[in-house]
Amino acid sequence: MIRAYPIIEDNMTAIWYHVPVCIRFISEGNIHALTGVNLILRNADGQILHESTISLSHIPPHSLKDYQLYVTSSSLCEGDDVNWHTCIPSFDIPLMERRVDNLYKYLNFFKESGFKIIPNDTVPRNTLMDLNILGLELKTGSLSKLIDPEAYRVIEFANAEASDSITIRSCPFSFTNPLLFSDFLSVGGVNLKTTKDNETLGYLSDIKYLENMAGGIVTKSDTTGSIGLVLGNLRKYNGDGDLIFILSWEIIWKLIMKRFPDLSIRPSMKSSSGVDRICSVLPVVVSENNSLFWGSCVYYNQTTLVTNNHVIKQYIDRPVLVDCKIFLTSDQTIKLTNEDVVITPYEQLDLSFIKLSFANQKRFKEIDNIAPVEYDYFYLTGELVSTIGFGLYFNNLYVEPLESTGNISAKYSLPLYKGDNATLPCIIVTSASCWNGSSGGGLFKQSSNQLVGLICSNAQVILPALGEEEDENTEKLSKTVLCIPIEVINSCYENLHTRDKSELNDRIGHTWNLIPYHNDIIVSKPKL
């Protein structure tokens, strides 16, 4: 159980501390490893009031009797020696008791949508119901008496918002080199905060998942606030991408207090500074018979949406046979009809405008938190930006986009139309992530939250040939994203309302298709 020390003290004046630990599970012919966290509640005199070592485990509790358990931490390593201490389970709490629990339904959606949940799916016959909060204690003594007090850091239990910077402290590659990886830092951002019934279930992040990272503690970078523990990796079967799921402390503490109702140690949750966000990026769902796919669109102005042509091309080609819906909320949609006009200004540009019918314009205006975008022409290479779109998966019960932060890696300018002398940006490359389904979403300048571009595609590169391989293998780069600049979008939109349509510069199409048109000139020193 959770260790409570016989000290009478007002817990409100005490402070929580934490340190990551590495946990091994060893049986005949089978090994597993997790990261965990040792939590202590310490008063002003340095006395420990409560202590608990916990992790999020994929090992079914009934199987634990077959394993020997060992724990270590970075301060228990001496020179080349890693000191492992025998430990035993002190409690286990199922993360989900019923299949109607919000957390079960949320994770099960991924299971039914072509995802594996790692490490849970690495154990044969495991189900989501096997996931649990595992408590550990040493066979003799307490872990806090072995770990260097200076190794502990203050922890506040907090919430986060999309785009917040986070750090995962974990112990990956436990069986490879625990000396090197006993307190490993991974830095990235929150892509999505998941809430249901006014409760934060957890967070998604595109930080790279590493083996044995489950149970790692996640903190808001450069703060003492922790938002939860790593539950695992949501990895799509087809290789489209993966995300880490972080279970919130709100859920973890709720389950612990339900198991141990007499405990008086539940900490208060430090709320995030997030505000209600105005939504300008919406999912587009295109369906025909039993096939369905989705993309994203931007609420461009009061009458118009903008997206990529490839997102709605099936609907454009076969409007009678194909349905195209825009999700406004989880339970409100609009369906495009022949009263909505779709215009693709140029075949060379993957850009389409949807002029909404009066009825659909009215539906948009009835939703309080949906508004047209504002845009910004002033952005520089290196500037911080965010991509917002419905990439990798679409869950109509949680109509929330993924948000990823990065920089403008490059932008290139050309005359947009034939005969023009003035140039404007015609392509932006960003390091913020996107995935299948993000197409048609927005690229936003972080400092102003204003639109600077439209997500179009990931870069796809040819991998080096190995040995005698003849097949050409390619790789999609989720952090190399091509976007249509706002200058191009606005100019094309204005051109819709002119009598004489300008002709697009051929080099625009060449640039977007990565067709080279430059001249290589080798400059050498003149002979004397």
Which residues make up each language-model segment?
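Short coil-to-beta-strand transition motifs
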Residues: 13-17, 30-33, 83, 180-187, ...
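Catalytic nucleophile loop of clan PA
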Residues: 26, 206-230, 298-299, 431-455, ...
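Flexible, gly/ser-rich surface segments that form the specificity/activation loops bordering the active-site cleft
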Residues: 95, 99-102, 108-111, 147-203, ...
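Generic structural signal for buried aliphatic residues
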Residues: 32, 39, 164-167, 218, ...
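Catalytic histidine site
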Residues: 1-99, 232, 276-325, 457
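Conserved catalytic-core segment of clan PA serine endopeptidases
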Residues: 49, 55-144, 269-276, 287-292, ...
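C-terminal cap/linker of serine protease catalytic domains
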Residues: 39, 56-93, 226-286, 361-363, ...
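A generic structural motif
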Residues: 31-35, 47, 130-141, 203-205, ...
